Structures are given as C-alpha cells and as structure tokens.
Design a protein with these regions (language model features):
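Active-site region of glycoside hydrolase catalytic domains
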Residues: 1-250
Length: 250
C-alpha cells in the first residue's frame, strides 16, 4: 500500500507557512481530479480508522454507504507507511491567514516529464506523514525522468539525475537527522522501462536500455549511486565541506 501524491511544502520555515502547507497537504481544497487530495482520503481510513470529515462532505454525492464493517476491514494494524513522492508545490500563509499557492520562478528546474524539482517536498512529505500517522516510513518511489542519450564515447552522462538524487537524498538525510523514522528509500528506478502512463517515452532508470536491441548501459548516475550505497550517503553534497557533489566516473 503506497499512494502517490504531490506534497505541499512551505515557502519558508516559519510556523505559519508550515501550518498552511500541512493544511493543504491533508486538505480537500484542490479539484477532485488532482492527486493532491489522496493523502488523507486514502491513508486516514487505513491508519486512523476513519475517513476525513472534510472529504466525506466534499464527496458526499459520489460515495456509497460506508459501514462499520467496512472500516473494520480497512483499518488494519500496519507496520509502516509507504509513500511515493516525486515533487511538490509551494504554499505560504496569506495575509488573511488562509493558505496561498506560490508560483515557481520562470526557468526553475524540471525533469524530463516536466515535473518540478522540489527536494523540499520529500523532507516535508516525510515530516507531515510522520506527524500524522506516527509510524515508520518507507519512501517507496522517488526518481526522475531525463532525456538520456548515448554520447559519442558510448556512455550515458546524466548529470541532471545525479544532481536531482543528491538533493532529494539530502532531504531524506535531514529528516533522519531530525529523528524521523525513515526505514527505507526505493529509487525509481533501476532500468529504463515501460512506464504505465507514458510507455517508453520517459527514462527513469540508472541503467539505459536500448529498446530495440535490449542492450544495457550503466549511466553515470548508476556509478554515483553505487558509491552512495557503499559509503552510506557520506558522499552526498550535504555531507561535504563546500556542499559539492562528488561525481563518480565509470
């Protein structure tokens, strides 16, 4: 059980902005076709044994009868929370006290899929989920698609993916350093593959796959990630004196 969602994260680390982001993350203000509402709607029944009142009111016209027997079946003792987190959106507390969406500056980084690069979302996703459900947590998916190509030297040089993963893993380490019970992180993904929504268009893998010949080429990020695992994260830029990324060559 691992929902996917965008994370509302605060524009600053002020208490007001953090509270506003948390309200939006677990709230129901977004359109019904937006995945941002799935956090509390899907996870509260499983972990807390009840549907959020706000969601019951919003979806009242579409819901079947929810019985006590339903909730007994849904609400089971689980060992951990699993969450897929790729990106998020910035929220601040407005002058009237209500949450406001903050536009990203033009030219800020995006992945090949067009998703924003927002490592803050991973930290605050972990933090907010831990505070709400009080269980150990796995990040069950995180990664990025890029426009990977084989270079003239026969290698795949995906520095953007290394930069992305360095920032997101730094966010995970911050959460761990602050005492949050992160017990695992799963990178999406090892091999370029058929993505359920985009087919072969998007390449998320650490290993490049030639879909015609099935040839595999380890990308630069694969060598870098090997060292991250070997060194238990000590080569992440957040652990370096000048915050530099230690790129690993094949």
């Amino acid at each position: 059980y691992a929902p996917t969602c965008g994370v509302a994260y605060p524009a600053t680390e002020s208490a007001d902005d953090i509270a506003a982001a948390k309200k939006v993350y677990f709230g129901f203000e977004n359109p019904m076709d937006n995945w941002t509402w799935n956090v509390a709607w899907f996870s509260d029944p499983v972990f807390l044994g009840e549907y959020p009142k706000e969601g019951l009111e919003k979806f009242a016209d579409y819901l079947p009868e929810i019985t006590e027997e339903d909730m007994q079946l849904i609400h089971q003792p689980l060992d951990f929370v699993g969450q897929n987190i790729y990106n998020g959106y910035m929220i601040r507390c407005g002058a009237d006290g209500d949450p406001e969406y903050v536009d990203r500056a033009p030219g800020t980084a995006k992945t090949g899929t067009g998703w924003p690069v927002t490592p803050e979302a991973l930290y605050y996703g972990i933090r907010f989920l831990t505070e709400r459900y009080r269980l150990p947590l796995y990040i069950t998916e995180n990664g990025m698609s890029d426009l990977d190509n084989i270079s003239a030297d026969g290698q795949v040089h995906d520095r953007e993916r290394i930069t992305f993963l360095d920032a997101y893993l730094g966010a995970v380490q911050r959460a761990i350093n602050e005492g949050m019970p992160v017990i695992g992180y799963f990178l999406w993904t090892f091999l370029d593959n058929f993505e359920w929504a985009e087919g072969y268009k998007e390449r998320f893998g650490l290993v490049y796959v030639d879909y015609t010949t099935q040839r595999r080429i380890a990308k630069d990020s694969a060598y870098w990630y090997r060292e991250v695992m070997r060194m238990n994260g000590e080569n992440l830029s957040c652990n370096q004196p000048y915050k530099q990324i230690l790129f690993m060559e094949p």
